[in-house]
């Protein structure tokens, strides 16, 4: 049975969940392209997906903003069809053994500051800045950082007059506690400064592998938030950033010094990290850690395969004394065995297919996994966002949740 939305998009398997609603892999039937489809039950009050889709539409045209293909209602669901993206920074962080190099962190920081600045220029704050909500593009856009999930976004100023929202206190925590600003923990209304402070914690998370306030135990969620808040406030910025370039501490101190309605100096923050980038002698080649890991795994797999073939060739010759001294091709023909072709060297720019059947080594499996991850395919993921990945740990290729199948979405049965 084939499920369709908007009479143009084929609904596939579930690939994640956003702030509100579930996300599915889909196909644009006319174009033959894969898309991401976000669904929300029409009974949801207020209709969060409708609000989020309106924000996305306001953001359209910005660099690193996913393209919206279609919005509407289908059966019992509100639907938003979006551009399909690659893995999140959280997925890639795990892929890189939870450690990014300084070069990769600085390349990311530059783009992430720009994404947040763009959202602010459109009169909104994101309020959930975290690694899961930054995704890499696919194909030619593989080096572009996207920002997603506007389910918690809020307008902070009037679009026409630029009148800022008023300062308020006693607000509940909105966002993710791990990356929330101190003022957010204190119940203060969020503004532009809070998005940027959250980004500072994300960058230190990439440096450290984890933040000091992770893994704290508590009986209730409220108590856990309080423990995180206490640890965050009792950890001086200089202690958090100790052992890393001073620019990270400078960044966080700058964010914390901003007043509620201040416009941040985004250019200053970008330049802070760009100057560090140049002093380190890095090149703006947009080669991230996961690119190197992918290529390194490919080279290692190729070397291992070459070594395996050499071993087999030596073993074959040792078992067949009559063929010693003959070229391998001649001996192969003489004995009626299959000719063994020399392995094709793997280079970054050329991949020659080898159609000969052969066992797949562990190293080669790792290479394929790394390449699939780089393209956005599933590798033990659990992201909460719009991605081009499949959560195979929870759902098989053929599974589509029953509540979607019975929703009144257009069904096409091929016999």
Swiss-Prot record:
Its EC number is 2.7.11.1, 2.7.11.26. GO terms for cellular component: centrosome; Golgi apparatus; nucleus; perinuclear region of cytoplasm; plasma membrane; spindle. The modification Omega-N-methylarginine is found at residue 375. ATP binds at residues 15-23, 38. InterPro entries: CK1_Ser-Thr_kinase, Kinase-like_dom_sf, Prot_kinase_dom, Protein_kinase_ATP_BS, Ser/Thr_kinase_AS. The modification Phosphoserine is found at residues 328, 331, 370, 382-384, 407, 411. Residues 301-415 are annotated as: Disordered. Autophosphorylated on serine and threonine residues; this autophosphorylation represses activity. Reactivated by phosphatase-mediated dephosphorylation. May be dephosphorylated by PP1. The active site is at 128 (proton acceptor). Residues 9-277 form the Protein kinase domain. GO terms for biological process: circadian regulation of gene expression; positive regulation of proteasomal ubiquitin-dependent protein catabolic process; protein phosphorylation; regulation of circadian rhythm; Wnt signaling pathway. Residues 347-358, 380-400 have a biased composition (Polar residues). The keyword Cell cycle does not apply. CDD domains: STKc_CK1_delta_epsilon. Residues 301-315 have a biased composition (Basic and acidic residues). Keywords: ATP-binding, Biological rhythms, Cell membrane, Cytoplasm, Cytoskeleton, Golgi apparatus, Kinase, Membrane, Methylation, Nucleotide-binding, Nucleus, Phosphoprotein, Serine/threonine-protein kinase, Transferase, Wnt signaling pathway. It is found in: Cytoplasm; Nucleus; Cytoplasm, Cytoskeleton, Microtubule organizing center, Centrosome; Cytoplasm, Perinuclear region. Its main location: cytoplasm. It is an enzyme of class 2 (transferase). It catalyses: L-seryl-[protein] + ATP = O-phospho-L-seryl-[protein] + ADP + H(+); L-threonyl-[protein] + ATP = O-phospho-L-threonyl-[protein] + ADP + H(+); L-seryl-[tau protein] + ATP = O-phospho-L-seryl-[tau protein] + ADP + H(+); L-threonyl-[tau protein] + ATP = O-phospho-L-threonyl-[tau protein] + ADP + H(+). Exhibits substrate-dependent heparin activation. Drug-mediated inhibition leads to a delay of the oscillations with the magnitude of this effect dependent upon the timing of drug administration. Inhibited by phosphorylation. Monomer. Component of the circadian core oscillator, which includes the CRY proteins, CLOCK, or NPAS2, ARTNL/BMAL1 or ARTNL2/BMAL2, CSNK1D and/or CSNK1E, TIMELESS and the PER proteins. Interacts with DNMT1 and MAP1A. Interacts directly with PER1 and PER2 which may lead to their degradation. Interacts with MAPT/TAU, SNAPIN, DBNDD2, AIB1/NCOA3 and ESR1. Interacts with AKAP9/AKAP450; this interaction promotes centrosomal subcellular location. Binds to tubulins in mitotic cells upon DNA damage. Interacts with GJA1. Belongs to the protein kinase superfamily. CK1 Ser/Thr protein kinase family. Casein kinase I subfamily. This is Casein kinase I isoform delta.
């Amino acid at each position: 049975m084939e499920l369709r939305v908007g009479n143009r998009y084929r609904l596939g398997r579930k690939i994640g969940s956003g702030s509100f609603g579930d996300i599915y892999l889909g196909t644009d039937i006319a174009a033959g392209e894969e898309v991401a489809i976000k669904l929300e039950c029409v009974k949801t009050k207020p209709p969060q997906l409708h609000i989020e889709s309106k924000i996305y539409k306001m953001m359209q045209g910005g660099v690193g903003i996913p393209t919206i293909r279609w919005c509407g209602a289908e059966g019992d669901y509100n639907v938003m069809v979006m551009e399909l993206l690659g893995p999140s920074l959280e997925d890639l962080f795990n892929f890189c053994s939870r450690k990014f190099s300084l070069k990769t962190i600085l390349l990311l920081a530059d783009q992430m500051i720009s994404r947040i600045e763009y959202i602010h220029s459109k009169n909104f704050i994101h309020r959930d800045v975290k690694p899961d909500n930054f995704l890499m593009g696919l194909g030619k856009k593989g080096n572009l950082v996207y920002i997603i999930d506007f389910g918690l976004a809020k307008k902070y100023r009037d679009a026409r007059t630029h009148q800022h929202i008023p300062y308020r206190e006693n607000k509940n925590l909105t966002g993710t506690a791990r990356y929330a600003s101190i003022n957010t923990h204190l119940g203060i209304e969020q503004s532009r400064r809070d998005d940027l402070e959250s980004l500072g914690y994300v960058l230190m998370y990439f440096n450290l592998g984890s933040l000091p306030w992770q893994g704290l135990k508590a009986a209730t969620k409220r108590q856990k938030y309080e423990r995180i808040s206490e640890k965050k406030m009792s950890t001086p910025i200089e202690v958090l950033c100790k052992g890393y370039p001073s620019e990270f501490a400078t960044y966080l101190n700058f964010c914390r010094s901003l007043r509620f309605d201040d416009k941040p100096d985004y250019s200053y923050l970008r330049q802070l990290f760009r100057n560090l980038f140049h002093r380190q002698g890095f090149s703006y080649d947009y080669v991230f850690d996961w690119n190197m890991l992918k290529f390194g795994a490919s080279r290692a797999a190729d070397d291992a395969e070459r070594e395996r073939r050499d071993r087999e060739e030596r073993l074959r010759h040792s078992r067949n004394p009559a063929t010693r001294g003959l070229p391998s091709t001649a001996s192969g023909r003489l004995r009626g065995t299959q000719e063994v072709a020399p392995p094709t060297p793997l280079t970054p720019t050329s991949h020659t297919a080898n159609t000969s059947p052969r066992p797949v080594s562990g190293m080669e499996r790792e290479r394929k996994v790394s390449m699939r991850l780089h393209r956005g395919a599933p590798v033990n993921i659990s992201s909460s966002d719009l991605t081009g990945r499949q959560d195979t740990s929870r759902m098989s290729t053929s599974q589509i949740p029953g509540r979607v199948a019975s929703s009144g979405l257009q069904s096409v049965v091929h016999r």
